[in-house]
Amino acid sequence: MIKKEFISDWTKEKIGLPADAPLTREALEAYQVKKLRETVAMAKKNSTFYGRLFASVDPERDIMSTKDMQKLPFTSPADLLAEEEGLLCVRPGEISRIVTLETSGTQGKPKRVYFTKEDQELTTAYFWIGLHNMADDTDRALILLPCRRPGSVGDLFRIGAERMDVFTIPYGLPGMRELERGNKGNGRGETFKQELEELLKLMAEKDVTFILGIPGQVAALAQLWTEKRAEAQDPLIVERLEKVKASMRTVLLSADYVSAEARNAIETAWECKIFEHYGMTEMGLGGAVSCYVLDGYHYREADLFFEIINPETGELVKDGEYGEIVFTTLTRKGMPFIRYRTGDRSRFLTEPCPCGCILKRLERVGPREK
């Protein structure tokens, strides 16, 4: 059974509230202030980069409320590119995974984000908790994100899903086989289409009820289903395609902007619920996710602190106003990020969510500027 209140209960446990106590903004913000102080102090002590950046900062004196974070300088992807290991707060031997992100700047030098085993467990736990809002132990989840390497995003999702007894089908990122064969096209050639056709067969064979994937790829899969269904004459093919639609209940889109066209293609094909996830590698992969109301994203306030700033002035905007998302990690040990500018545009939704959860909501995040 889907447990819609699970994320609130988990947050209460994370911040140290008794099970019978209500989750309040006051309790949550007191926890965040404590964690912000601890994070800044830990980073200042253990990181050469943060040691320089926060040389004049005394967390116990300077961070008395969450609003005091605006006194601290920003960090950015440029700092990660320039410093890399200077942001580390643990010995290299404590790092269990390094994620490399290609960039267009600094002559194509990649960004590298470092995680300890404990950091990755935070992500797995978040995936596990978030899934309680949209899936249960009757689901059969097709994972269309990288999942072959231990600790990859799809692998962490698999572990989280299996903790709640969801049957998982770790497939990987569609289109990778085309690239492995040397086709450097746009990922929409005949080989890619053939792979999508194979995926539709797999969905029917495995009674897939849930898909996790990138918006454009899941939309392409749904569009192909629509085309195949419109032209199908063979009763066996019709039966297989209808079986896919009858089984599908939920799609979780992640890793990219969700366009209206992508949503429409999926809804037209399968008439299923579409949840959206917002995150980035620097956040620890998981950032914020739709609740069952499907209006904005609740963000993981026990692990992250979000601010919305005016990108021109760097000043905080009022709740409800648009600006750039800035985040600080509260529980990361290997490579914490403090007031990290994402370049993503959104706003905090000020109306209470009908789901009853008090965790702050972001409006749907727009496409990231290149």
Q: Where do the language-model regions lie?
A:
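Generic structural marker for isolated residues within well-ordered, non-membrane alpha-helices
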Residues: 100, 128, 158, 211, ...
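Short, compositionally biased "basic patch" segments
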Residues: 94-109, 153-167, 200
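Nucleotide 5′-phosphate-binding alpha/beta core
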Residues: 1-102, 108-133, 205, 246, ...
